[in-house]
Amino acid sequence: MALPCSFSVALVLLSCHSLCCLACHLPDTHGLRNWRVLTLLGQMRRLSAGSCDHYTNDFAFPKELFDGQRLQEAQALSVVHVMTQKVFHLFCPDTSSAPWNMTLLEELCSGLSEQLDDLEACPLQEAGLAETPLMHEDSTLRTYFQRISLYLQDRNHSPCAWEMVRAEIGRSFFSSTILQERIRRRK
């Protein structure tokens, strides 16, 4: 299903310059890749939300990590890195049981991999992360993704369970995009 035009335009505007201005000077293409990941997640939708009503779940997304008010640039960069890493490991294992179109899945995994390369090339010490312990933020995100993994296991990786996870990851990745834009605007 195609995203509404105004939503797509908003994603482009928010993502184009989202991380390029953080302390580590990520490439301009990083924000575009973020938009592409969101688009691919939307295109991967295979089931209508109504057909999976009995699968709804509150994964307790840690919104407080993405409000942009508490985090410094280096902390935001770390949160974005952990988030991207966890999404990659969720959708891109060597043997995926997900019911996705393989072409879309491969493109998603490629985009996430490129984003991780950008983030891992950023020297975190220069960004000030060496002085800023992020144990709580890291643990909170890991717990969130653990809940998602357990949900998939409990639901036997069914197509409806994957649809709920895809929608959840789309919302959380959008929050990551908003965080990146807020940090960029502070500069």
From Swiss-Prot:
GO biological process, one term: response to exogenous dsRNA
Disulfide pairings: C24-C122, C52-C160
Signal peptide: 1-23
Annotated glycosylation sites: N101
Keywords, sorted A to Z: Antiviral defense, Cytokine, Disulfide bond, Glycoprotein, Secreted, Signal
Family: Belongs to the alpha/beta interferon family.
Name of the protein described by the UniProt record: Interferon alpha-1/2
Provenance organism: Canis lupus familiaris
